[in-house]
Amino acid sequence: MRHRKKGKKIGRTASHRKRTLQSLSNALIENKSITTTVAKAKALRPFVEPLITRAKEDTQHNRREVFRHLQSNDAIDELFGEVSERVGDRPGGYTRIIKLGQRSGDGAELALIELVDYNDVPPADTGQGGSGGTRRGSGKGRRTSTEEEQADASSSGDSSDEESESVEEDEATAEEASADAEQGEAEEEEESEEDNT
């Protein structure tokens, strides 16, 4: 019977799987986010979250239990020091998995797994398609058609100012170029007069 055998196999033997999850956990704790395959990210989440929960209470017993899984003093110090302070008031759900698409070499589905409390900066709006928010957005921050028209009108006004500035700059450079050309012609005439005399 397969009782108490929770977890994904991820195509590895038990010892290989244990070391893979250990290595991924150490990297996640030390770097706060890692890029890996979706299957490994999904297997890593239930492995690392109980360790983070144990790290909230810094006792010798908890340190030994976590060390049993991680086998890295640097990761233990980071987990019980900085990470446990950040997640102290969070009741669970310390990690987030974001799918990134396929890897170009073998087509494997990639994912970014990160510690939630370390992603304070929201992603910058690139202005390229999409709603600009999360997929689970409730639609509260979306623009109405009148707001979009006002934004378009203000941006077209800005572009006309930019166009007039660029026209003025072009005229100034044209005047400088013509002045340089006249000066060059005057110098050539002086040289030709000197040659004639």
Curated annotation (Swiss-Prot):
InterPro entries: Ribosomal_bL17, Ribosomal_bL17_CS, Ribosomal_bL17_sf. Residues 127-136 have a biased composition (Gly residues). Keywords: Ribonucleoprotein, Ribosomal protein. Residues 120-197 are annotated as: Disordered. Pfam families: Ribosomal_L17 (PF01196). Residues 159-197 have a biased composition (Acidic residues). PROSITE patterns: RIBOSOMAL_L17. Signal peptide: none annotated. GO terms for biological process: translation. HAMAP family: Ribosomal_bL17. This is Large ribosomal subunit protein bL17. It comes from Salinibacter ruber (strain DSM 13855 / M31).
